[in-house]
């Protein structure tokens, strides 16, 4: 099987992203070289795994985190940095499928997720450039009217008072572009530097006694009353409980999860610091943006006045050679005034989606669990997911069961057939975007 941990990035190195230029990369933490026993073992030192470790420590549990590469190496340290509201489905769709009572649970958990992000930042004094405000930007009038309906529903039915509708004139004035027809501003959402955030969580976890091993790849798991994990170096871990939190990089450590979660790649560029007079209103407001395309554009400005712009996906294992130019073309459609701006950074990352885009919480066995598949909505949801896992282990909450009972169906066909099927499906939606 192709190893997604190594196919697109040099082994043991962070990608050369804008985010890595903003932090001081620490020395590699020790890899596991001896056999150990632990209460709880967590595979993956990303947002989910570190949130789980910190939440477990809060409840008096000890955990060990095994990271195949570097702390925050995957999507956790590469994403667009948006701390969004709600789930991947809007509330109307959740109500249609599950009824209002369950839709309310989804909403309350998502609201708690944002609060948990803010709480971790404040509690651990993580300097990650957090700022409030995310704009849902719509590419046509139909999407704009739909966004207004969503805003009304959230305000009236869920008492969410943080939304401000934007017409074409209003959104154009804020974003310094005529590309979008309207949308809304969500002041209850926000954005941050994800690598600073995840590294801050890692530092906090180590401070409270969590043992984190980097460059420690698990190659085999024997599930049972106790879990036996074997690493590529031959070290063995025996744990009472196990959490698989590798998301798009999990591979076949649990084939049932792998059949329900599809790794896909997404790409981001960052310009040179913008010249005086460019995007002045956008700089002043300092909001993040996600638009209404099926494969959305998402962007925001950095503290040093670069435009960080995400655009484009691919559905094969390897990043395409031209992804920088693909993302740049998408940026120029939104901001033609930046056609002569240099692109200083470009990077890709692998996230994980499910068929219905709801997160995949699974009971692998009586003592092993997996959480993955945030489908591009994971900065806040991964943090609450880790907390939910910790509460479940401590028998303080049934919310893990709430998510584990969601209908997350396997992708059709064996793994070798899923990629071409996914490509065909995504190409159809991409073509649909072009004619909207």
Residue ranges and their predicted role:
Residues 317-319, 324-434:
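C-terminal catalytic lobe of FAD-dependent flavoproteins
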Residues 87-169:
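Dinucleotide-binding Rossmann-like beta1-alpha1 core, especially the glycine-rich loop
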Residues 36-65:
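N-terminal Rossmann-like FAD-binding beta1-loop-alpha1 element of flavoenzymes
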């Amino acid at each position: 099987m192709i190893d997604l941990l190594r196919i697109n990035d040099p082994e043991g190195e962070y990608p050369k992203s804008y985010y890595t230029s903003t932090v001081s990369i620490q020395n590699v933490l020790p890899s596991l070289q001896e056999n150990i026993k632990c209460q709880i073992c967590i595979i993956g030192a990303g947002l989910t795994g570190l949130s789980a470790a910190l939440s477990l420590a809060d409840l008096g549990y000890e955990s060990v985190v095994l990271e195949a590469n570097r702390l925050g190496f995957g999507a956790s340290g590469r994403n667009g940095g948006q701390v969004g509201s709600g789930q991947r489905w809007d509330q109307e769709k959740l109500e249609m499928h599950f009824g209002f009572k369950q839709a309310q649970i989804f909403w309350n958990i998502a609201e708690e997720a944002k609060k948990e992000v803010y709480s971790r930042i404040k509690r651990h004094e993580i300097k990650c450039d957090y700022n409030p405000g995310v704009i849902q930007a719509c590419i046509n009038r139909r999407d704009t009217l739909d966004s207004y309906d969503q805003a009304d529903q959230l305000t009236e039915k869920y008492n969410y008072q943080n939304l401000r509708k934007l017409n074409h004139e209003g959104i154009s004035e804020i974003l310094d572009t005529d590309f979008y027809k309207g949308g809304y501003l969500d002041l209850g959402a926000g954005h941050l530097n994800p690598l600073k955030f995840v590294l801050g969580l890692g530092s906090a976890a180590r401070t409270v006694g969590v043992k984190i091993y980097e460059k420690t790849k698990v190659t085999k798991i024997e599930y049972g009353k106790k879990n036996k994990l074997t690493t590529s170096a031959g070290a063995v871990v025996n744990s009472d409980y196990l959490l698989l939190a590798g998301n798009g990089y999990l591979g076949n450590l649990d084939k049932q999860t792998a059949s329900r979660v599809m790794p896909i790649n997404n790409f981001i560029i960052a310009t040179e610091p913008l010249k005086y007079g460019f995007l002045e209103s956008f700089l002043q407001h300092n909001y993040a943006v996600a638009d209404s395309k099926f494969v959305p554009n998402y962007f925001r400005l950095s503290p040093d006045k670069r435009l960080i712009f995400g655009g484009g996906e691919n559905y094969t294992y390897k990043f395409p050679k031209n992804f920088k130019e693909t993302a740049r073309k998408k940026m120029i459609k939104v901001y033609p005034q930046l056609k002569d701006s240099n692109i200083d950074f470009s990077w890709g990352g692998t996230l994980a989606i499910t068929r219905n885009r709801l997160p995949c919480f699974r009971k692998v066995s009586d003592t092993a669990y997996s959480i993955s598949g945030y489908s591009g909505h994971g900065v806040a949801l991964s943090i609450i997911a880790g907390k939910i896992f910790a509460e479940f282990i401590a028998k303080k909450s049934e919310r893990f069961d709430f998510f584990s009972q969601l209908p997350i169906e396997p992708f059709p066909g064996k793994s070798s057939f899923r990629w071409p099927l996914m490509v065909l499906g995504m190409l159809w939606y991409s073509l649909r975007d072009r004619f909207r």
